[in-house]
């Protein structure tokens, strides 16, 4: 951890709740590093914010597909500008309307959609917060959860993320992250290098983001358009 004589930045540490973490190991590491800002447990059960569950599932899918989050979403949304239908590719076993309606069932249903549900949620979340917050959370998560042995390639990826969002005066610098990343003399290394920084950034995502997404025009207009199209086809 990078320590400085000036601790004024600690005033910016938000009140952290268990719902801001995906696992207990993250809570333990946070409490170890910030004993004066320990995680508050509101309930007996560890219930993570719905939006973090969705982002986690997106990151895991990206790892499985072996493609970077930013590149994949950029490609999908770029194609959508030319042809909205390009977002919605799936087997004919389930209709587009059925899939979009299923997004209301649970965060898992939204994340599992191959019709573009997760991409639209990411777009909505960036509008609510910032591109930097969402991209850092996803990229640091993919780095953390990729099951590869420590090595030069992994260290290079950690350095890339660090240089992109944390180091010095980088264009996409996120305030205070430098104090929350575990950096040795060799640089940012190790699976948990971004574990506290990721949790900190996650606090910027509103607890009710998933619910707001389902009430937002970005979703409601899409559902209306698809429902209208289905009606016309059946006439």
Swiss-Prot record:
Keywords: Signal transduction inhibitor. One of its GO terms (biological process) is negative regulation of signal transduction. SMART domains: RGS. The keyword Transferase does not apply. The keyword Zinc does not apply. Coiled coil: none annotated. This is Regulator of G-protein signaling rgs-9. It comes from Caenorhabditis elegans. The lineage of its organism: Eukaryota, Metazoa, Ecdysozoa, Nematoda, Chromadorea.
């Amino acid at each position: 951890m990078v320590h400085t004589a000036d601790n004024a930045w600690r005033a910016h540490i938000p009140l952290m709740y268990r719902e801001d973490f995906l696992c207990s190991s993250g809570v333990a590491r946070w409490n170890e590093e910030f004993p004066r800002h320990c995680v508050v447990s509101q309930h007996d059960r560890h219930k993570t914010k719905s939006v973090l569950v969705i982002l986690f599932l997106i990151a895991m899918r990206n790892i499985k597909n072996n493609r970077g989050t930013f590149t994949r979403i950029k490609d999908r949304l770029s194609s959508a500008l030319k042809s909205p239908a390009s977002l919605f590719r799936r087997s004919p076993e389930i209709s587009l309307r059925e899939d979009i309606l299923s997004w209301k069932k649970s965060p898992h249903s939204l994340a599992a959609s191959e019709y573009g549900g997760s991409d639209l949620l990411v777009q909505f979340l960036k509008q609510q917060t910032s591109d930097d917050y969402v991209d850092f959370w996803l990229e640091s998560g993919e780095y953390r959860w990729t099951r590869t042995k420590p090595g030069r390639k992994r260290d290079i990826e950690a350095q890339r993320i660090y240089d992109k969002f944390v180091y010095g005066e980088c264009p996409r610098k996120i305030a205070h992250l430098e104090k929350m990343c575990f950096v040795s003399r060799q640089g940012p290394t190790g699976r948990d290098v971004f574990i506290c920084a990721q949790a900190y950034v996650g606090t910027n995502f509103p607890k009710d983001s998933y619910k707001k997404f389902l009430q937002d025009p970005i979703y409601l207009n899409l559902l209306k358009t698809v429902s209208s199209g289905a009606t016309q086809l059946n006439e």
